[in-house]
């Protein structure tokens, strides 16, 4: 039987918004021009102690600006739109859906240094399922911003919960933070793990154990 598609309409903070210290979005009122961004890179090169006009660095400001457009492309995405179509005809399936080992890279909002890792997402469908690739796209939409791992974990779970209205969502994120490896304490290879649960996963510890077991199975 052909799957039945349905579009969902849910209003969450716009992708052009940024978070305040409280976690609530704050409108970005003015975006600098590309020329201003490139000038800022030249200033940083000089501050680091090098000459932005030497041959190897002459085109670096343009390259950095182009790279940042891709690296921080999540600001131009609305994660709720990624999930706005569901397959309602799933032949009675109502058990857990798990997508694990979703690779991502993000940037620490404190030092603008990368943190790199994997996300694991599970949910119990209530009225339909989304394409599996959509969950990976939601991870990317939030990861490609200035972030903390804790906030990103909560954003992923809360968005899936708000849009799909499942019986529960579980998200685990594990990552290595280069700000910890390259500066400060300088401890490479240290992993940070964060989790966020909603619905049955939050209410029932056995469901949390099941999720964690499935994530770790055959590793």
From Swiss-Prot:
Keyword list, A-Z: GTP-binding, Hydrolase, Metal-binding, Nucleotide-binding, One-carbon metabolism, Zinc
Extract one GO molecular function annotation from the record. GTP binding
- Statement: the UniProt record of this protein carries the keyword Transcription: no
- Provide the reaction this enzyme catalyses: GTP + H2O = 7,8-dihydroneopterin 3'-triphosphate + formate + H(+)
The cross-references to SUPFAM superfamilies, in alphabetical order and at most eight, read: Tetrahydrobiopterin biosynthesis enzymes-like (SSF55620)
InterPro entries registered for this protein in UniProt: GTP-CH-I_C/QueF, GTP-CH-I_N, GTP_CycHdrlase_I, GTP_CycHdrlase_I_CS, GTP_CycHdrlase_I_dom
Q: Which Pfam families match?
A: GTP_cyclohydroI
Top enzyme class, one word, equals hydrolase
Q: Could you tell me which PROSITE patterns the record lists for this protein?
A: GTP_CYCLOHYDROL_1_1 (PS00859)
Highest taxon of the lineage? Bacteria
Pathway note: Cofactor biosynthesis; 7,8-dihydroneopterin triphosphate biosynthesis; 7,8-dihydroneopterin triphosphate from GTP: step 1/1
Q: What are the GO BP annotations of this UniProt entry? A: one-carbon metabolic process; tetrahydrobiopterin biosynthetic process; tetrahydrofolate biosynthetic process
Which stretches does UniProt call biased (Basic and acidic residues)?
Answer: 14-37
Residues reported to bind Zn(2+): 108, 111, 179
- Please provide, in alphabetical order, the Gene Ontology terms of the cellular component aspect for this entry: cytoplasm
- This protein's record includes keyword Cell inner membrane: no
Renumbered to this chain, region (Disordered) spans: 1-37
Entry-linked HAMAP family:
FolE (MF_00223)
Q: How does it assemble?
A: Homomer.
Q: Which family does it belong to?
A: Belongs to the GTP cyclohydrolase I family.
Q: What is this protein called?
A: GTP cyclohydrolase 1
Name of the gene this protein is made from: folE
């Amino acid at each position: 039987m052909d799957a039945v598609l349905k579009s969902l309409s849910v209003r969450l903070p716009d992708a052009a918004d940024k978070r305040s210290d409280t976690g609530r979005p704050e409108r970005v009122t003015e975006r600098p021009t590309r020329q201003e961004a490139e000038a800022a890179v030249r200033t940083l090169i000089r501050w680091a102690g090098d000459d932005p006009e030497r041959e190897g660095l002459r085109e670096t400001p343009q390259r950095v600006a182009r790279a940042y457009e891709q690296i921080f492309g999540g600001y131009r995405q609305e994660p709720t739109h990624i999930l706005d179509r569901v397959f309602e005809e799933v032949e009675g399936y109502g058990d857990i859906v798990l997508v694990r080992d979703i690779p991502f890279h993000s940037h620490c909002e404190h030092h603008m240094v990368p943190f790199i890792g994997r996300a694991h997402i599970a949910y119990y469908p209530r009225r339909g399922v989304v394409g599996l690739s959509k969950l990976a796209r939601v991870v990317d939409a939030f990861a490609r911003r200035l972030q903390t791992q804790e906030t990103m974990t909560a954003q992923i779970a809360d968005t899936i919960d708000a849009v799909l209205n499942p019986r529960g969502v579980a998200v685990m994120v594990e990552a290595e933070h280069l700000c910890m490896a390259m500066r400060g304490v300088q401890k490479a290879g240290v992993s940070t793990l964060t989790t966020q649960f909603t619905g049955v996963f939050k209410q029932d510890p056995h469901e949390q154990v099941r999720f964690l077991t499935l994530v770790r199975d055959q590793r």
